[in-house]
UniProtKB/Swiss-Prot annotation:
<dbReference type="GO" id="GO:0008104">
    <property type="term" value="P:protein localization"/>
</dbReference>
<dbReference type="InterPro" id="IPR023410">
    <property type="entry name" value="14-3-3_domain"/>
</dbReference>
<dbReference type="InterPro" id="IPR000308">
    <property type="entry name" value="14-3-3"/>
</dbReference>
<dbReference type="Pfam" id="PF00244">
    <property type="entry name" value="14-3-3"/>
</dbReference>
<protein>
    <recommendedName>
        <fullName>14-3-3-like protein</fullName>
    </recommendedName>
</protein>
<dbReference type="InterPro" id="IPR036815">
    <property type="entry name" value="14-3-3_dom_sf"/>
</dbReference>
<dbReference type="GO" id="GO:0007165">
    <property type="term" value="P:signal transduction"/>
</dbReference>
<feature type="compositionally biased region" description="Basic and acidic residues">
    <location>
        <begin position="247"/>
        <end position="259"/>
    </location>
</feature>
<feature type="region of interest" description="Disordered">
    <location>
        <begin position="237"/>
        <end position="259"/>
    </location>
</feature>
<dbReference type="InterPro" id="IPR023409">
    <property type="entry name" value="14-3-3_CS"/>
</dbReference>
<comment type="similarity">
    <text>Belongs to the 14-3-3 family.</text>
</comment>
<dbReference type="GO" id="GO:0005737">
    <property type="term" value="C:cytoplasm"/>
</dbReference>
Length: 259
């Protein structure tokens, strides 16, 4: 007998507590692939957190290995560089597999089944996030360009709905603005567009702060703080390595929470 939806959700929560995120992904994928009804807010957040942790560990590994590779290259240690490159390529294969998995699920199930503006923006933002993660490490000009174009398309689709349907203080709309601005800054090397987008989102939210409901107050104000942190970083005379401190969404906010 197939596992019930409730049992898979429970097992996903259990896996999260045990920090077994690959298994958490498996349980939530089972839930997402059942075409009975779309995911609840709790279920989509569980899926998001599962994938965020699985991809986050590899993204961190890739950054560390890439940094070591650059240092060894500058020292002329060719033997070490060769070994490091092999290891980096292995991590990149894992990153690609993870991104392909969630992007396939978004394409086949999650985006088509989304019935509310909130869920549509949530999943389109998620789609943009995982295309962005591909763009972070793809070195081939064609592959990187394709990943960047797909990111832009998904974020713009999400933005169109968010601006029309969600309030400026909605955590999912704010989370989208946060990650979209990071994309402009890091992937497209467009600091002006990044700052404009982040500032507009922050200012629009500030103007309607008194309408913010208690339930989303914590999530919304956290993302606003991250937007402000990035604006401070991007508009100050910082060194290149300060980019490492660019802030994205937190672990488990309503706005998906990618980093």
């Amino acid at each position: 007998m197939a596992d019930s939806r409730e049992e898979n959700v429970y097992m996903a929560k259990l896996a999260e507590q045990a920090e077994r995120y690959e298994e958490m992904v498996e349980f939530m994928e089972k839930v997402a692939k059942v075409d009975v009804e779309e995911l609840t807010v709790e279920e989509r957040n569980l899926l998001s957190v599962a994938y965020k942790n699985v991809i986050g560990a590899r993204r961190a590994s890739w950054r560390i290995i890439s940094s070591i590779e650059q240092k060894e290259e500058s020292r002329g240690n060719e033997d070490h560089v060769s070994s490091i490159k092999e290891y980096r390529v292995k991590i990149e294969a894992e990153l690609s597999k993870i991104c392909d998995g969630i992007l396939s699920l978004l394409e086949s199930h999650l985006v088509p089944s989304a019935s509310t503006a909130e869920s549509k923006v949530f999943y389109l933002k998620m789609k943009g996030d995982y295309h962005r993660y591909l763009a972070e490490f793809k070195t081939g000009a064609r592959e990187r360009k394709e990943a960047a174009e797909n990111t832009l398309l998904a974020y713009k689709s999400a933005q169109d709905i968010a601006l029309a349907e969600l309030t400026p203080t909605h955590p999912i709309r704010l989370g989208l603005a946060l990650n979209f601005s990071v994309f402009y800054y890091e992937i497209l090397n467009s600091p002006d567009r990044a700052c404009n987008l982040a500032k507009q989102a922050f200012d629009d939210a500030i103007a309607e702060l008194d309408t913010l409901g208690e339930e989303s107050y914590k999530d919304s104000t956290l993302i606003m703080q991250l937007l402000r942190d990035n604006l401070t970083l991007w508009t100050s005379d910082t060194t290149d390595d300060a980019e490492d401190e660019i802030r994205e969404g937190s672990k488990q906010e309503s706005g998906d929470g990618q980093q």
